[in-house]
Amino acid sequence: MLNIDEASALANWIQNWKKTYKENPKLNECFTWFEWKYQDRELTSSDKSSIATILRYNSEE
């Protein structure tokens, strides 16, 4: 499960991506960013579910 700081960092990254590319990142791009940012963590199925939820929430106009 993602902690508050990780979730916030991911949400900020998604918002910055949208400003730069004028589209939402793909889910796999979010996974890749998270693995790059937190190299000491292995993504669990719970993490992936949380990331998908954060992406969905931040994809709304």
Please provide the spans of the model-predicted regions.
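Short, charged early-sequence alpha-helical segments and their helix-coil boundaries
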Residues: 41-61
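Short runs of predominantly hydrophobic/aromatic residues within well-ordered alpha helices
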Residues: 7-10, 27, 48
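Charged, low-complexity interaction regions
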Residues: 18-28, 40-45
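N-terminal acidic leader/helix
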Residues: 2-21
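Generic L/I/V-rich hydrophobic alpha-helical segments across diverse proteins
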Residues: 14, 27, 31-34, 38, ...
